[in-house]
UniProtKB/Swiss-Prot annotation:
Regions annotated as coiled coil: none
Xref: SUPFAM superfamilies: ClpS-like (SSF54736)
NCBIfam families membership: PRK13019.1-4 (NF009564)
Domain of life, source organism: Bacteria
Gene that this polypeptide is encoded by: clpS1
Summary of subunit composition and partner proteins: Binds to the N-terminal domain of the chaperone ClpA.
GO BP annotations listed: protein catabolic process; proteolysis
Alphabetical list of HAMAP family matching this protein: ClpS
Described function: Involved in the modulation of the specificity of the ClpAP-mediated ATP-dependent protein degradation.
UniProt protein name: ATP-dependent Clp protease adapter protein ClpS 1
Organism: Rhodopseudomonas palustris (strain ATCC BAA-98 / CGA009)
Family note: Belongs to the ClpS family.
């Protein structure tokens, strides 16, 4: 038997730096053709808002031209915006949701 120590003398600890995912805003863009009731129903369905919350978002977009609907990770924001926009397109409305990075 030999007295050889096979254990390393130094303890190397790898520090893994985990960054938080970048967040993106989903934005409702106002148009003059999509019925308000339909916008509210999409907001309730896709973004799980109450009737009051959805109505406030819809009215803000109507008055200001745009309104932030919510803030999500990039993938979730893009998916929700696409699904909500597609819901309008399926009914023949120009309903538009966009995304942009949160600053």
């Amino acid at each position: 038997m030999s007295n050889i120590d096979l254990k390393p003398k130094t303890k190397a600890k790898a520090k893994i730096k985990v960054e938080r995912p970048k967040l993106h805003k989903v934005i409702l863009v106002n148009d003059d053709y999509t019925p308000r009731e339909f916008v509210v129903s999409v907001l309730k369905g896709e973004f799980r808002m109450t009737e009051d919350q959805a109505t406030k978002v819809m009215l803000t977009a109507h008055q200001r031209g745009v309104c932030v609907v919510g803030v999500f990770t990039k993938d979730v924001a893009e998916t929700k915006a696409t699904r909500a926009t597609d819901a309008g397109r399926a009914k023949g409305y120009p309903l538009l949701f966009t995304t942009e990075p949160e600053e």
